[in-house]
Amino acid sequence: MIPWHYHTAVTDWYFCLAGILRVETRASRGDERLAVCARYQIPPKTAHRISNGGGGDCQFLPLQGIGAYDFNKVQA
């Protein structure tokens, strides 16, 4: 699991490669489960966490946009 956090200026993209990827945000969409080949965009300053959304293994590819990287922890 990637714990609750946000980025000040960087957009995150997550691509599900295997299994089911769970993307939780504190924005309007809240809780999404991605199947293989699905993607999810998280804009800057949006608190989010990433975890396995199914019973089996999960693989995903995180990509981050251009900008200074930071990892700002958020209370659960």
What kind of region is each of these model predictions?
Residues 27-45:
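Short acidic-glycine-tyrosine-enriched beta hairpin
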